Amino acid sequence: MALSERLKKFKIVRKILYAIIGMVSYPGFMWVNKLTISGTENIKGLPKENVLFVCNHQTYFADVITLLHIFCAVKWGKENKLGVPYYLLNPFTNVYYVAAEETMKSSWLSKLFTMAGALTVKRTWNSKSTEKRRGLDPSDTRKIQRALEKNWVIQFPQGTTTPFAPGRKGTAHLIKMNRPIVIPVIIDGFSTAFNKQGLKFNKRGTRLSVQFKESLPVNYDAPAEEILDQVMTAIGQKRL
């Protein structure tokens, strides 16, 4: 097991990383750009385990960092705002996020983000290879399932930052197998404000928005295609 994989299991390591990443990123969300948040009443009071957040995807890192900020703020009793980031003194760390393995190995910074709670999975398709897999590797699926047992998990069903890309059935199968509470999240403005990695500014003064919707009334026994269609509609990514 890689060092980063071992370290992220220690909450104190993740708390320190959250505090550092949070302080560095906060000005970009709140001062350089303008973040608006809605729907945090839908995540307040959720259990600390078996909650799956499904979200559209606009940048590699800024999306996730923003969600982590919000989760920490909600833990401290804030509603639909970040306010002064004193929540970073004791951040909420019962959360993991699914990320492509190749992305998280691409630089020292991405390896640092891995220790903040990344569940690295192999892409179902790699632009540098002719190989195309039909779904998640079984070991990747088990990794996400284990995380859900005691934590929240953030997943991007499209697996890409391309808008209106089709969703992956792996998300639906995960929902069928684990029967989590499913919270749809819609984000906007991040692809305008930041570069693809989400680490550099493209356009300052951009309105960033994050909306948490009510939990999906999922029929866990429905076909995977039906569940996936429900998820994609909820996150505003179904082509009409």
Residue ranges and their predicted role:
Residues 149-154, 159-226:
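A cross-family acyltransferase "interaction/gating" segment
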Residues 118-164:
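Internal catalytic-core helix/loop-beta-alpha segment
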Residues 47-131:
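Catalytic core of membrane glycerolipid acyltransferases/transacylases, capturing the structured
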Residues 36-39, 105, 137-141, 167-171:
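Amphipathic coiled-coil/heptad-repeat helices and related helical stalk/stem segments
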Residues 2-39, 66, 107-116:
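A transmembrane-helix-recognition feature enriched in membrane-embedded lipid enzymes
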Residues 41-47, 144-146:
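Short amphipathic alpha-helix with an adjacent loop that forms part of the alpha/beta core around
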Residues 14, 28-34, 98, 129-135, ...:
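Short, flexible loop segments at the rims of nucleotide/cofactor-binding pockets, characterized by
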Residues 147, 230, 234-238:
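C-terminal alpha-helix
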